[in-house]
Amino acid sequence: MIRRVKREIRVIGFDDGTFPHKKRGEKVILVGIVMKGGSDVLGAVSRWITIDGLDVTEAIIDSILSSRFRGDLRVILLKGITYAGFNVVDVNRVFRETGLPLIVVVRKRPDFEAIENALRKHFEDWEKRMELIKAGGKIYELIPGKVYYQAIGIDAETAAKIIRATSRNSLIPEALRIAHIVASAVMRGESSKE
């Protein structure tokens, strides 16, 4: 339990690389950036995950539990709940198995109706994926129209404080911003815009 949010809180933020011209079943990189607050990068982890697969949950859990940073981490930051297309994170399982609370940060409020329609159209197991997406719980608005978040294993107020404490050069936590830069550079040869 996080009683007080310190500016130097140790977080790990995950994002995947862009994947133009790749097809379902191919691999994309998932990068986790370990930071002290919003200023110091302490390290990084990476795993390959399957486009539209169901392996991102295991990748996140494994990258944390096998990391030398494991004992220092206090929070997991996710840039959305889906990676590599519709490879959906089971946020409750990640919380149970790592013991770390999660904060899911997004720039646009999710349109669950559009997501469900896309899942129905392309996946036989659409109900399972939709259930995992909704398991993130209530969506909170941090900056009206610009930043939204979900809090798993942590209260919403503390989660908001952590987002603010770890954001420096953008509206989202620095660990997520850097994870995006690194992951997109690995996949494209150059980083892409958020």
UniProtKB/Swiss-Prot annotation:
InterPro entries in UniProt: Endo_dU (IPR002802)
Entries under Pfam families matching the protein: DUF99
Top-level taxon in the UniProt lineage: Archaea
Gene3D superfamilies, per database record: archaeoglobus fulgidus dsm 4304 superfamily
HAMAP family to which the protein is assigned, alphabetical: UPF0215
NCBIfam families assigned to the protein according to its UniProt record, in alphabetical order: PRK00766.1
Family: Belongs to the UPF0215 family.
Stated name of the protein: UPF0215 protein PF2042
Organism, scientific name: Pyrococcus furiosus (strain ATCC 43587 / DSM 3638 / JCM 8422 / Vc1)
